[in-house]
From Swiss-Prot:
Pfam families: KH_dom-like, MMR_HSR1. Residues 361-445 form the KH-like domain. GTPase that plays an essential role in the late steps of ribosome biogenesis. HAMAP family: GTPase_Der. GTP 2 binds at residues 191-198, 238-242, 303-306. This is GTPase Der. GTP 1 binds at residues 9-16, 56-60, 119-122. GO terms for biological process: ribosome biogenesis.
Length: 456
């Protein structure tokens, strides 16, 4: 089992910056405003030859019982319980605060190894603050700058005695189909604010891992959690709610939206979560269109279904709306769920697995050729300026999503309506519901184009 370290401390001392530094990529949102991190976030860290699991936490900050702030602290306490050691981070430039002293006592009571990290130690003011931190009684401070990467050598030396050595890694090799099938399916859950995304994931996990609240915008980072459901692994990203651009006012919310968009691009299947009490709005269409443009498989989950009084015909009406407004993902799976009550979870997970399979599908060449001949025989391409367009052949270039190249005589003259006909026919023939289908046009070279005409 991996050695686990939790990063703790008061808000805005640079915990998320240190987390990003150790995992080697910008996974956690970072901003000067305190309280950016709300949920605990895990990542695989590497420092030299040391490998360990790192947990970023919300800043330790008291609050009334049951409040969002208090529940953020509960998340931090859970992270401390899971950890084998702690990084206690202070802001050396700001010097010690009463909150630092209070939470140093909190760290001592955890009865686990604690490394005191004096962050932002660059410059004279930083050095003075680091010296002041001896008063916390947590040992010698390690002076670092998480933003600039300073002090990582000293941190490595301090960690060597704590983190157990890992076995030598096997030689890297190209991933096989079997290994790819064994990997967790990457799933992003997106939607308007307060649609119930975090509630659904908490039900899947069986614990309140992600903070939930009636207040829209509780989730800020894209939090990744790994689950196993009926023997299949999933890596699920909970994301911040996506509002219309005109409603995105705060700088932090803009960062959160950008983080959610990155999660969509990293995912393989995207679940668009909708509130059953607020039927399709323009923003839902925009989000679905974004998912299609990014080439991800789509599943629509209609949440809070337990609150609906009149249910008959609702899904059929929604299906009609989706197929009308989003023909580019015609046939997308639509599942009614209740994240709070756990209703419809099996159907949702099955829809994710099936959509992932469709997204990875390759059409056999012989079947593709038969379909192509029948499609153009049933509906030949139109004539343009009195000249018939010639479609030569089609080939699949890749999956994820299914993508094809169509060789033809005049690529610029083929109408978009005829391309839509081919895509819809292909989607129906090869059962490709809810996944983007790409057809790229390419002109077949004319072997006589380079020859000059004979003079008359």
């Amino acid at each position: 089992m991996s050695f686990t370290i939790a990063i703790i401390g008061r808000p805005n001392v640079g915990k998320s910056t240190l987390f990003n530094r150790l995992v080697g990529q910008k996974l956690a949102l970072v901003d000067d405003m305190p309280g950016v991190t709300r949920d605990r976030r895990e990542g695989e860290a590497k420092l030299g030859d040391l490998q360990f699991t790192i947990i970023d936490t919300a800043g330790l900050d008291g609050g009334p019982k049951g409040s969002l702030t208090a529940r953020m602290q509960e998340q931090t306490e859970t992270a401390i319980a899971l950890a084998d050691a702690l990084f206690f981070v202070i802001d050396a430039r700001a010097g010690l605060t009463p909150a630092d002293r209070t939470f140093a006592d909190f760290a001592r009571r955890a009865d686990k190894p604690v490394l005191l990290l004096a962050n932002k130690s660059e410059g004279k003011h930083g050095e003075l603050g680091a010296m002041e931190s001896y008063a916390l009684g947590l040992g010698d401070p390690i002076q670092i700058s998480a933003e600039h990467g300073e002090g990582m050598g000293e941190l490595y030396d301090a960690l060597r005695g704590l983190v157990p050595e890992t076995e030598d890694e096997v030689d890297e090799h190209e991933e096989t189909d079997e290994e790819r099938a064994a990997r967790p399916i990457r799933v992003a859950i997106v939607g308007r604010p307060n649609a119930g995304k975090s509630t659904l994931i908490n039900h899947l996990l069986g614990e309140e891992r992600l903070l939930t609240s009636p207040e829209a915008g509780t989730t800020r980072d894209s939090i990744a959690v790994e689950i196993e459901y009926k023997g299949r692994g999933f890596r699920i990203f909970d994301t911040a709610g996506l509002r219309r651009r005109s409603r995105i006012e705060e700088k932090l919310e803009k960062l959160s939206v950008a983080d959610a968009l990155r999660a969509v691009r990293f995912a393989e299947v995207v679940v668009l979560m909708m509130d059953a009490q607020n039927r399709f709005e323009e923003q839902d269409l925009r989000i679905a269109d974004l998912i299609e443009r990014e080439g991800r498989a789509l599943v629509i989950a209609v949440n809070k279904w337990d609150l609906m009084e009149s249910k008959p015909g609702q899904i059929s009406a929604l299906r009609h709306d989706v197929d009308h407004w989003l023909p580019q993902v015609s046939g997308v799976p639509i599942v009614a769920v209740s994240g709070l009550m756990g209703e419809g979870i099996d159907r949702l997970m099955q829809a994710i697995v099936e959509s992932y399979a469709v997204w990875n599908r390759r059409v056999p060449t012989a079947a593709l050729n038969r379909w192509f001949e029948e499609a153009i025989a049933n509906n030949p391409p139109p004539a343009v300026s009195g000249r018939r367009l010639k479609l030569n052949y089609i080939t699949q270039t890749k999956a994820r999503p299914p993508s094809f190249v169509l060789f033809c005589s005049r690529a610029d003259a083929i109408p978009q309506s005829y391309l839509r006909y081919l895509i819809n026919s292909m989607r129906e023939t090869f059962e490709l519901p809810g996944t983007p289908v790409r057809i790229t046009l390419r002109e077949k070279a004319n072997p006589f184009a380079h020859k000059r005409k004979r003079p008359s």
